[in-house]
């Protein structure tokens, strides 16, 4: 299991309590899951068909007042996250969206509006509706502009948590475009040499098409790890690796409790000597594209992270870009395929079986889901879904 976990640490920012061993070069999933249950003391996963997960999310969101089409957009994204293996941003996040609608900090019945527009750019007001609805509107607008004039650059204010950034960049890839998506987030990250958190994990996604349905899909935070990994370490009462967080004195700490109690996350790279200032710079770049260009909340001015009892509107800023490679040198997908294959063909280090490119772990997870006829969930996640259904008086999630 060691090589599996190392591979996941390199390419993904998952809550590792949620089936982190699923991505493996071997797709003999029954044996893999059995091994996980025996060696890691984890119960066997429960499989649920994608269509059923999708219908369940829609049922829940409509029950709390979201428009049907908005609920569908959110469900598209959450199911995609779980299908791709990003369990921290799929069904696991449903309660957050429900609480935002029920609590009135997110609006369930408006639409995004365009406030400024040129042939290549647009400035959108999300009007405080669900982030995935805003994001879908913006990336589709960017793609349309890229088809017409070669590039589409769309910024939005008044948005909310939009899920995995890769979902939007992949929309562009499906249209033969290069896609980019960025969002600012609640300030949990301590900038290099600072004492307090002032920036979000501010994710970046860049995706590009290659031949034969291959692609490059980078989807990463600009912090070293996701907040969920630190929370998980605290629950397990285990120490953390270097570079994950600092205590309230600004000193690097291996104690998750110290990081969560007045400390903060470290930028990608960790300490300054290890290049953390570069992650800090990337997080500020995302703020430039998202908060500064759009006039949304930004940096330390964004509301604090709270998934249960939120009282403030998020007013997140987001940025979506589509580039038409046909406007540049011929043979783009050929070269992209060549580069991908050159990386995959590199000799792996001892203990590893293959070199992956961004997007490969997700492809393996999707293949595994397809082979098993559904998405694998931890039994606790199914229990949570059952309790959620009962609280909303909707039909339970049906398992395979």
PLM regions and their residue ranges:
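N-terminal mitochondrial targeting presequence
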Residues: 1-35
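Acidic, glycine/proline-rich low-complexity segments that act as flexible tails and inter-domain linkers
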Residues: 37-50, 55-74, 79-80, 87, ...
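Catalytic-core signal marking the mid-to-C-terminal active-site face
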Residues: 37-53, 288, 297-400
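Active-site cofactor/substrate anionic-group-binding motifs, chiefly glycine-
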Residues: 89-143
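Glycine-rich, Trp-frequent "lid" loop and neighboring beta-strands that shape
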Residues: 153-211
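Phosphate/diphosphate-binding glycine-rich loops and adjacent basic-rich segments that engage nucleotide
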Residues: 189-260
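Secondary-shell segments that build the walls of catalytic and ion/ligand-binding clefts
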Residues: 238-300, 305-307
